[in-house]
C-alpha cells in the first residue's frame, strides 16, 4: 500500500497544488495541507490500516480517487484553520465533482473522509511550525536588517518548496522545518538576488537567528539547488 501511494506521489502533489490554485486559496492553506497529507496522514496510514477498527470502505481499496478525496480533505481542514471564510462541505463536494474524474463522492463521503482523516492523525492538526510559516518569519526578519531582502523572490522560495514535496527522499527535509526554511531562504537569495549585491553576510545571519550551523545550511542549500536544477532540466 505504501508503495502504491509512493507511485502516485507526484500526481497527488500536483493535484493538491492545482486544487488550491483553482480554489484561490492562500499559500498557508496549500502548505498546511501538504504537511497534513504527506507529512502526517500518509506515514500514519499504514499503522492505522493494521488495526481492525481501521476498516472503512474509503480505505479499501485505497485507489487514486480515494486518495484525491483525502487530499481535498486536507485542504478543507487547512482552510478551516487559516481562512476567514472556510469552504462549505457542499462547495467542496461540487469542486470534487469537477476534479475527481474517476469516481463520484457524495456529501456524506466527504464528512466520513474527514473523520477518518482526523482519526489517522489522532486529531493532531496543528501547523504553526511548518516550514512555510518559519520561512515567512525569516523573510520578515531578513527584510528588517537588510535592504537586499526586498529583492529576494518569495515565489522562488515557494517553487522550491513545491518541488521538494514531489519525491519521497527530498520531502524528508520537511521533518526539520527550521533548517529547511533557512536553507530555502539562502537558496532563493543565491538564485534571485543579483550577484553584485551579495554584500549581506547571509550565512552568519541565518546561523544567528536559527542556531543552525553554517555547514549544515550550506549542505542543505547545495542539495536543494541540485534538486531544483535537475528538476528543471530538459
From Swiss-Prot:
Cell cycle in keyword set: yes
Gene Ontology terms: biological process: cell division; regulation of cell cycle
Transmembrane segments: none
The entry's keywords: Cell cycle, Cell division, Cyclin
Domain of life: Eukaryota
Homology family: Belongs to the cyclin family.
Protein name (Swiss-Prot/TrEMBL): Cyclin-J18
Source organism per UniProt: Arabidopsis thaliana (Mouse-ear cress)
Amino acid at each position: 500500500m505504501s508503495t502504491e501511494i509512493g507511485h502516485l506521489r507526484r500526481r497527488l502533489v500536483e493535484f493538491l497544488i492545482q486544487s488550491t490554485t483553482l480554489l484561490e486559496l492562500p499559500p498557508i492553506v496549500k502548505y498546511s495541507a501538504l504537511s497534513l497529507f504527506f507529512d502526517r496522514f500518509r506515514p500514519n496510514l499504514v499503522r492505522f490500516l493494521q488495526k481492525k477498527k481501521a476498516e472503512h470502505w474509503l480505505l479499501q481499496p485505497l485507489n487514486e480517487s480515494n486518495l484525491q478525496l483525502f487530499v481535498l480533505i486536507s485542504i478543507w481542514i487547512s482552510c478551516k484553520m487559516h481562512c476567514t471564510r472556510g469552504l462549505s462541505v457542499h462547495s467542496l463536494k461540487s469542486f470534487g465533482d469537477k476534479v475527481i474524474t474517476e469516481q463520484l463522492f457524495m456529501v456524506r463521503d466527504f464528512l466520513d473522509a474527514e473523520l477518518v482523516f482526523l482519526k489517522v492523525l489522532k486529531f493532531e492538526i496543528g501547523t504553526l511550525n511548518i516550514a512555510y510559516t518559519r520561512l515567512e518569519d525569516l523573510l520578515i526578519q531578513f527584510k528588517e536588517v537588510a535592504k537586499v531582502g526586498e529583492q529576494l523572490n518569495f515565489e522562488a522560495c515557494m517553487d522550491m518548496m513545491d518541488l521538494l514535496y514531489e519525491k519521497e527522499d527530498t520531502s524528508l527535509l520537511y521533518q526539520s522545518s527550521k533548517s529547511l526554511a533557512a536553507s530555502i531562504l539562502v537558496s532563493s537569495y543565491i538564485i534571485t538576488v543579483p550577484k553584485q549585491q551579495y554584500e549581506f553576510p547571509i550565512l552568519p545571519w541565518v546561523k544567528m537567528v536559527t542556531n543552525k550551523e553554517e555547514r549544515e545550511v550550506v549542505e542543505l542549500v547545495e542539495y536543494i539547488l541540485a534538486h531544483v536544477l535537475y528538476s528543471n532540466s530538459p
